[in-house]
């Protein structure tokens, strides 16, 4: 789904006379999309890829380079932010917040360069709502309507994309009186919505971005090296966060092994190997179907299959070999990270 916003951002940057784009990527889907969009419009693209994913997913790096992008493992020696992080911890595996800091720092130093973000911000959520709009059209054609929607949630772009168009219907009383349950599914190792604090925080580790009110684990939160790299972000989109704060959407956190169980089950049933991020939504959908089986309810379940896992097979290799582990981020560590939230008076 990432090209939905990458192409739009590249187009408008080109119209503004920008020559270069810097950006971050976790698992690499966003970096690939921005590299492709930059190639389409003749923009140079530099991608700071979270180090743990840089090692886990080498072929996404190859894709970005095929489309002409430069790719660096973050934290890197290219920026002061990266150098400081490496000085503090030479084995730092990186985070999306840290990669964002590096990309923003570089963009701020050059007049011909802008920074592009692949999630979190309002315009990204807007571009992604084409997903939910298309779903609504397809349900109208099928003569059906979902009872519940599941989508993975890190920064929030894929969840916003499928859920926001249905939020409008719910606010108006539902489609023919039918309200849709909207569920964001996040990793238990990075539980921004389910365990974070609703507060003003920076979107990056170094505090370069404007403050945003969101559910956050703290901008210097360093998540473990789970294989759903696209969900390793300390906060959730301000719009997603506001909806959750107001009780208009729900959120659940699921452990890593359960998501891979769901991904393999889906591959057996559908012949599609999902991305680790997508497995979170699939886990939610399967669990809902099993609940319906127990209660005898009939529900129409919609979930967002955000991508395939063809470049994530090393992660599946580790799962099949029994080498993956679950990790619930300790409450004490979350509380410690939240102590560093900015004081906004």
Regions found by a protein language model. Name each.
Residues 1-20, 120-140:
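Glycine-rich oxoanion-binding loops at beta->alpha junctions
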Residues 22, 30-93, 192-202, 313-321:
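Active-site-proximal loop->helix
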Residues 153-157, 161, 256-322:
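Claisen-condensing/thiolase-fold acyl-transfer catalytic domains that form or cleave C-C bonds
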